[in-house]
């Protein structure tokens, strides 16, 4: 059973769903044009991940092996419907902005993958924590990519935060620089694809530097036995 520290490390860095597993790229590329959209989808995905992992872990002993995937999908779809209704009620502007990508959480490979690979084989608490940290790992990449694209494309940060947090959040909007015309590439999916590649490259460089700092284990020289 994985420890809490291992779950945090795997979810946020070593096995990050976006930068290592490369799962959920469709919403990652399409929705991360602004920090607000990225954060909204990240929170929704995290809630579904926690709920699906917890429920799958609780009922795993009663699910026949042959039909486990359809059952997992039904559980995920039910949770996505609940999240969609909540967002429709309390964050309607963001609900309209995210559009089809909210119900598409059902088909997100991250969620079904964690249900199959981890939740179905572990106790409820570790399963819920795995969902939490995998969701936060995905959300962190979404928000970081959204920040890069929003700054390059609009020169702003937290634009439209009131759609997620309420009217008071209009004060969070920061205009870093004024642009007469938008940097269109940053706002379109190809720009998001380049941004993801940039983040993956940075992560790989950091991993390589960390690996180089580790003391190399010297291999013990094995002497051949002489047989006479």
Swiss-Prot record:
Subcellular location as annotated: Cell inner membrane
Keyword Transmembrane set for record: yes
EC number(s) from the headed UniProt entry: 7.-.-.-
Transmembrane regions listed in the UniProt entry: 18-38, 39-59, 69-89, 93-113, 128-148, 182-202
A Pfam family reported for this protein in Swiss-Prot or TrEMBL: Rnf-Nqr
Keywords: Cell inner membrane, Cell membrane, Electron transport, Membrane, Translocase, Transmembrane, Transmembrane helix, Transport
Topology class, membrane: Multi-pass membrane protein
GO cellular component: plasma membrane
Protein name: Ion-translocating oxidoreductase complex subunit E
Organism, scientific name: Aliivibrio salmonicida (strain LFI1238)
Gene that encodes the chain: rnfE
